[in-house]
From Swiss-Prot:
Disulfide bonds: 45-66, 49-61, 55-70
Name under which the protein is recorded: WAP four-disulfide core domain protein 13
Molecular function terms, GO-annotated: serine-type endopeptidase inhibitor activity
Organism whose genome encodes this protein: Homo sapiens (Human)
Summary of the function given for this chain in its UniProt record: Putative acid-stable proteinase inhibitor.
Superkingdom of the organism of origin: Eukaryota
Gene name for this UniProt entry: WFDC13
Any GO BP: innate immune response
């Protein structure tokens, strides 16, 4: 085995690690600390939460346009309205 081969492997390995932004610890902490996006539009943006235990039964702590709030766990069906040249998605009532 040539002595150049391990050196080439080491250089490629170091360059590949630089392409990945952030450390694995930061990515894991971000996933744990930030709640998932809401699956339905929040009914009330005043019920803020920091943990799942802050929400009542049937609600989940999630991230929405108005912050981290308690939102319904059920998926909200949306109606599709077609217009000329575009499509608009509206919440179902």
């Amino acid at each position: 085995m040539k002595p150049v081969l391990p050196l080439q492997f080491l250089v490629v390995f170091c360059l590949a690690l630089q392409l990945v932004p952030g450390s694995p610890k930061q990515r894991v902490l971000k996933y744990i600390l930030e709640p998932p996006p809401c699956i339905s539009a929040p009914e009330n943006c005043t019920h803020l939460c920091t943990m799942q235990e802050d929400c009542e039964k049937g609600f989940q702590c999630c991230s929405s346009f108005c912050g981290i709030v308690c939102s319904s766990e059920t998926f909200q069906k949306r109606n599709r309205i077609k217009h000329k040249g575009s499509e608009v998605i509206m919440p179902a009532n």
